[in-house]
């Protein structure tokens, strides 16, 4: 996972509250078996409306989404984070996030920056009055800068550390690679191993239902 320190990109104002994961990416797209290529699914139900913000030329290449409160509610699906990242978003700013969405975001390298609603309102006004305005997000300083607005944001220390270090779950595990290798080299032979089956079961297996 790429380290996140600061990011500057075009801000996209999404004046909608309670945006749930099914609105972020409809369930029909979850049938895909790949982990990438979900950019076309992002906000699919809304993008058919030509007035939707992502259909406006000034915002099509945005990378900082500024949303309403309670973003990411609904069912837990990593695909919501994947769709946002595949489209090009690095940061989502909102005054409140669903806990599971916030957790999934941190694990996938998407920064969920919690900003006071009064500051979100000010940022929206700037982005709507001056489409294409860039937003700078400084994770080290926990600060968002838009034009003359400087707003602090909240993020838990553990997620902030993971993003700064660029550590997803696999990266965290690989930090202990030497310890894992040493353990495997000295583990007792009687401990169970996960190996492919090398023989048929000693007892015949009877199908629960007749096989045609």
Curated annotation (Swiss-Prot):
Q: What is the lineage of its organism?
A: Bacteria, Bacillati, Actinomycetota, Actinomycetes, Micrococcales
Enumerate the catalysed reactions: (2R,3S)-3-isopropylmalate = (2S)-2-isopropylmalate
Record's keyword terms, sorted: Amino-acid biosynthesis, Branched-chain amino acid biosynthesis, Leucine biosynthesis, Lyase
Output this protein's name: 3-isopropylmalate dehydratase small subunit
Named in its record, the pathway it takes part in is:
Amino-acid biosynthesis; L-leucine biosynthesis; L-leucine from 3-methyl-2-oxobutanoate: step 2/4
Q: Which GO terms describe its cellular component?
A: 3-isopropylmalate dehydratase complex
Q: Which family does it belong to?
A: Belongs to the LeuD family. LeuD type 1 subfamily.
- Indicate whether Lyase appears among the record's keywords: yes
Q: What does this protein do?
A: Catalyzes the isomerization between 2-isopropylmalate and 3-isopropylmalate, via the formation of 2-isopropylmaleate.
The cross-references to InterPro entries, in alphabetical order and at most eight, read: 3-IsopropMal_deHydase_ssu (IPR004431), Aconitase/3IPM_dehydase_swvl (IPR015928), AconitaseA/IPMdHydase_ssu_swvl (IPR000573), IPMI_Swivel (IPR033940), LeuD (IPR050075)
HAMAP family this protein is in? LeuD_type1
Q: Name one GO biological process term.
A: L-leucine biosynthetic process
Q: Which organism is it from?
A: Beutenbergia cavernae (strain ATCC BAA-8 / DSM 12333 / CCUG 43141 / JCM 11478 / NBRC 16432 / NCIMB 13614 / HKI 0122)
GO function terms (MF aspect) = 3-isopropylmalate dehydratase activity
Subunit-level organization: Heterodimer of LeuC and LeuD.
EC class = lyase
Query: EC number(s) for this protein?
Result: 4.2.1.33
CDD domains assigned to the protein according to its UniProt record, in alphabetical order: IPMI_Swivel
